[in-house]
UniProtKB/Swiss-Prot annotation:
Organism: Pseudomonas fluorescens (strain SBW25)
Any one Gene Ontology molecular-function term assigned to this protein's record: tRNA binding
Main location, first listed in the record: cytoplasm
Disulphide bond pairs: C346-C457
Domain of life per record: Bacteria
Places the protein is found: Cytoplasm
Task performed by this protein: Catalyzes the ATP-dependent transfer of a sulfur to tRNA to produce 4-thiouridine in position 8 of tRNAs, which functions as a near-UV photosensor. Also catalyzes the transfer of sulfur to the sulfur carrier protein ThiS, forming ThiS-thiocarboxylate. This is a step in the synthesis of thiazole, in the thiamine biosynthesis pathway. The sulfur is donated as persulfide by IscS.
EC numbers, comma separated: 2.8.1.4
PANTHER family in alphabetical order: TRNA SULFURTRANSFERASE
PROSITE patterns named among the record's database cross-references: RHODANESE_3, THUMP
Residues noted as binding ATP in the record, renumbered to the chain: L185, M186, K267, G289, Q298
Name the record gives this protein: tRNA sulfurtransferase
Gene3D superfamilies reported in the protein's UniProt record: 3.30.2130.30, HUPs (3.40.50.620), Rhodanese-like domain (3.40.250.10)
Family: Belongs to the ThiI family.
């Protein structure tokens, strides 16, 4: 299969050195993301696109390849094509007929040709000749440039002809690794996950920082969604997941700070800690999911007070977004189900919070706070490569993996319902039940405790995370199912 990858249009207006660097980075990212599917994948760069060739033919692998490229920053869209040496107009018509001939009968169609290089003919010459001949020879109902039922598409580059089968859109932006890095403050809710996506989509490599207010279950949930976002949109780069134990910080705020100022003080403590971590990682910008006046701490006066504790640039991709738009985008990118079942602690600690806090009052409240507690939280922060979060769950719980389900055991398919429906898990003689990952922890207690349950997902990431949590909660009848 051959693909022509069209780069993000804003890349094409850069200077020659910058453009070359960005396209080389994109080619490197594509190879990294597709390496496990096809170690021999070939990616070659030209001035405004990349050409990708793979010898794999297995439909599932090709589908995976398409999905990964559709989620890669730096790509505007890509075309699946067949390549031929450029012949005369009759030869071009014949090649188009091979691919489109049967589908044109009784249809209204158009011919679209893009051309680069020096030729004795124009793109319109090709379109007129090929369109006229296909209409006569394929029994088409007619030609319409404005409202065709089928578009016969091709590209001509120098002495090469590309007949286009399909086009797949991607997410645009710049290639990860070509721009600077950021540190995203993650709570796992709608806002922070969408903010992380927006910043990664633009091309900024993003590490994840989680302030743990809610115990191990909350940490595992944020690990899960952070890993999902990275795997889907940023796996060409290795980034870190940073977990900062903030329960003691929160306790100090609850005990020492006036109730009306707790939210602002908590956010200021988070920004102080995040800035220190960013210094350690040589990162110049922080990212949050805040939007104007969505909650009391997010009014303009309060945001200004929060920002003044750091010299870092604080990026807020969602600052002017409506909540429903954020939720809709979370549904689109796949983080909504995580967010719906993620506890949100930052917004529940204040009663009658100040929407226009005064700097001198906030600083007075913080004088009551023992800063040694914040230092202790930073000392105990854990920095783990995002692709190793599963390995870092700790040795406190042994997670058993099995490659074969035995009679009497129940395999629980915890994949997203769409994935379970597209590729149902069927095992001869074994009871397979579907229970989506986002509902598993809440509903597992309803299952028969006398049975053995094997958790299954495609890559084993979510199944291990949830097995760890359930085992930690005292359920001894849980294993991970990893068929060979």
């Amino acid at each position: 299969m051959k693909l022509i990858v069209k780069v993000f249009p804003e890349i094409t207006i850069k200077s020659r050195p910058v453009r070359t660097r960005f396209i080389r980075q994109l080619a490197k990212n594509i190879r990294a993301v597709l390496r496990d599917l096809d170690p021999a994948v070939v990616v070659n760069g030209v001035w405004d696109n990349l050409e990708l060739e793979t010898r794999i033919t297995e439909p599932k692998a090709l589908k995976d390849m398409t999905e990964r490229l559709s989620c890669m920053p730096g790509i505007a869209h890509f075309l699946q094509v067949d390549e031929y040496p450029l012949g005369d107009f009759d030869d071009i018509t014949e090649k188009c007929k091979q691919h489109y001939g049967q589908s044109l009968e009784g249809k209204i169609f158009s011919v679209r040709c893009k051309r680069a290089g020096k030729h004795t003919f124009s793109s319109m010459d090709v379109e007129k000749y090929v369109g006229s001949k296909l209409r006569r020879e394929c029994g088409a109902a007619g030609i319409s440039l404005k409202a065709p039922q089928i578009e016969v598409r091709m590209e001509i580059r120098d002495q090469r002809l590309f007949v286009i089968h399909s086009q797949h859109d991607s997410i645009g932006g710049y290639p990860l690794g070509a721009l600077e890095q950021t540190l995203v403050l993650m709570s796992g809710g709608f806002d922070s996950t969408v903010a992380a996506y927006q910043i990664m989509r633009r091309g900024l490599m993003s590490h994840f920082c989680f302030f743990n207010l809610g115990g191990r279950a909350h940490e595992l949930g944020v690990m899960e969604v952070a890993h999902f976002i990275w795997k889907k949109y940023g796996s060409s780069q290795r980034v870190l997941f940073v977990s900062v134990p903030f329960e003691e910080v929160l306790g100090e705020i609850l005990g020492k700070v006036d109730n009306s100022h707790m939210g602002v003080v908590l956010k200021r403590m988070m920004l102080r800690a995040a800035s220190r971590i960013a210094d350690q990682l040589q990162i110049d910008a922080l990212v949050t999911g805040e939007a104007i006046s969505q909650v009391s701490s997010q009014t303009l006066p309060n945001l200004s007070l929060i920002d003044c504790v750091t010299e870092k640039l604080v990026l807020r991709p969602l600052i002017a977004s409506h909540k429903q738009d954020i939720i809709d985008l979370a549904e689109e990118i796949g983080t909504a189900d995580f967010a719906k079942h993620m506890p949100e602690y930052c917004g529940v600690i204040s009663v009658n919070p100040k929407t226009h806090a005064k700097r001198n009052r906030v600083e007075y409240e913080e004088q009551q706070f023992d800063m040694a507690i914040l230092e202790r939280a930073l000392e105990n922060a854990k920095l783990v490569p995002i692709d190793r979060v599963i390995d870092e769950l700790g040795q406190d719980v042994q997670i058993e993996e099995v490659s074969e389900a035995l009679a009497g055991q129940i395999v629980v398919d915890i994949r997203h319902p769409d994935a379970a429906e597209d590729e149902p898990l069927e095992i001869a003689g074994i009871d397979v039940q579907t229970l989506p990952f986002y509902a598993l922890n809440a509903r597992f207690k309803e299952l028969d405790n006398s049975r053995q349950y094997l958790l299954y997902c495609d890559k084993g990431v979510m199944s291990r995370l949830h097995a760890h949590h359930l085992l930690s909660e005292g359920y001894a009848n849980v294993r991970v199912y990893r068929p060979s």
